[in-house]
A protein has these predicted regions:
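Long, positively charged amphipathic alpha-helical accessory segments at protein N-termini or as interdomain linkers
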Residues: 1, 62-93, 99, 212-232, ...
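Structured beta-strand/loop patches that form or line metal/cofactor-binding pockets in enzymes
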Residues: 1-31, 234-241, 247-250, 337-357
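Active-site- and interface-proximal helix/loop "cap" or "latch" segments in soluble metabolic
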Residues: 17-100, 301
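Short acidic-glycine loop/turn motifs at beta-strand connectors
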Residues: 26-32, 148, 190, 243-244, ...
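A generic structural motif
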Residues: 39-43, 200-206, 272, 304-307
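N-terminal lobe of the biotin/lipoate ligase/transferase fold
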Residues: 96-208
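Contiguous, small/hydrophobic- and glycine-enriched helical/loop subdomains that border
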Residues: 193-240
């Protein structure tokens, strides 16, 4: 955390699946002062609120989240009950206050509905729109992907030869593309997945660890899935799962310009037999995930909901719009042209796809 200067601070954190935690405090001589915790959580006994405030007062403004949580926990009586939040949630809220983090309500949001593009254009557009948000030329944006041809999108740091079977890819006409974010490979055919990208200022996740930022940025998705009758959660670090199996995975890229990309692919109706012919899913990864078969690891949304892909997309768009007041927009011609240039100079070049052979 960067050095916290003296002055008033306000921080908020909505616990994924839990309650809102708010803190107002002063920083005096590098230490927390006049700390006031509030929120729509439940806490027993009443006196515990004052105990939490007292535990925070006097802490160094450079304290880590772990140190803050430990201070709160050590001050609480054994019979204290925290419902909808935790000492860790308090620590995150304090860190966000000290970092002068922004909240969802501080921004005007835009939604780009599914727009058909080549997969090369999609990964290039991710970089373009993140740069546009960083430059202030575009509001924070949620964009849904649409594509026609089968593709594999590998993570920025994955080995091409270790992740993709070239014979299988050629046999099934699969294009291999490398994205700018880390994480694992995505197998995508027309209509078989739901993919979206979020382009946000990093201030939105200031004070959050990388692990905490994933469920924080996808709380609206969990609400969407709940509306569809699916109880889903994050399985650290970046898998989205239900009690019937994995349904998706997320990846992030934080740009030096101050923006970040967060994107998710969820399986809708995957051809698992074809997937295992194209992707080389290592035994080590399957073992770590507690399963022996790649085909059994993924449980598509179509089977779990019985709904069309369009119905699921409509629910997701509606949920995000209602939750954050987002307005529909499109991709400008200038953004399209910049993406085309990036495809030609970077994303469709042998140097990029083979950057990790």
């Amino acid at each position: 955390m960067s050095e916290a200067h003296d002055g008033s601070r306000h921080g908020e954190y909505k616990v994924p699946g839990g309650k809102l935690v708010v803190v107002d405090l002063e920083v005096k001589d590098g230490r927390l002062d006049s700390v006031s915790l509030s929120g729509d959580f439940f806490l027993e006994p009443d006196e515990a609120l004052a105990e939490i405030n007292a535990a925070l007062a006097g802490l160094s403004a450079e304290s880590t989240a772990e140190q803050i949580a430990d201070a709160v926990r050590s001050r609480l009586r054994p019979d204290t009950v925290l419902f909808g939040f935790s000492p860790e949630a308090v620590a995150i809220t304090v860190r966000r206050a000290l970092a002068k983090a922004t909240s969802w309500g501080d921004h005007e949001w835009e939604i780009i509905p599914p727009t058909p593009l080549s997969t090369h254009m999609h990964v290039a557009m991710d970089e373009v729109l993140a740069e546009e948000v960083a430059a202030g030329r575009r509001n924070p944006t949620l964009r849904f992907w649409e594509w026609e041809s089968p593709s594999v999108v590998i993570g920025s740091f994955q080995s091409l030869r270790n992740e993709v079977d070239p014979d299988g890819a050629e046999r099934h006409g699969v294009t291999v593309v490398r994205r700018i974010s880390g994480g694992g490979a995505m197998f995508m055919e027309h209509g078989n997945a739901i993919t979206y990208s979020l382009y946000v200022p990093q201030s939105l996740v200031d004070g959050l660890s990388f692990a905490d930022s994933y469920p924080f940025l996808d709380a609206w998705v969990m609400e969407s899935l709940e509306r569809l009758g699916i109880k889903a959660w994050y399985q650290p670090l970046n898998d989205i799962a239900t009690d019937q199996g994995k349904i998706g995975g997320a990846a992030q890229k934080r740009l030096s310009s101050g923006a970040m990309l967060h994107h998710v692919t969820m399986s809708y109706d995957i051809d698992a037999d074809k997937m295992v012919q194209v992707l080389r899913i290592g035994k080590e990864k399957l073992s770590d995930k507690g399963t022996r078969s790649a085909k059994k690891r993924v449980d598509p949304l179509r089977r779990q909901t019985g709904l069309s892909r369009e119905e699921i997309l409509d629910t997701m768009i509606q949920t995000f719009a209602e939750r954050y007041g987002a307005q529909r927009t499109g991709i400008s011609e200038a953004e399209m042209e910049r993406a085309r240039e990036k495809v030609a100079s970077k994303f469709d070049t042998p140097e990029w796809i083979n950057r990790v052979p």
